[in-house]
């Protein structure tokens, strides 16, 4: 588990934006939503942007998280998606 200070800096529950940057893929947004749904079921409408050269996609998704542990778990699992380079 990550050792963060989210619990000191934030009040839960709260809306938390995740930005997932990965290789350009038509399925990246679906895979991001699938991971989020496992932990925080709901209706999500992620936004997607392709890099200027078309090499990467960035997916932004806003999730209402309930705890520091949920924030950290989502960071870890989103980073484990195949082709993901960064989770911000």
From Swiss-Prot:
- GO CC annotations on file: cytosol
Gene3D superfamilies with a match to the protein in the record: 3.30.70.260
Origin: domain of life:
Bacteria
Family, according to the entry, reads as follows: Belongs to the UPF0250 family.
Q: What is this protein called?
A: UPF0250 protein Ssed_3490
> What species does this protein belong to?
Shewanella sediminis (strain HAW-EB3)
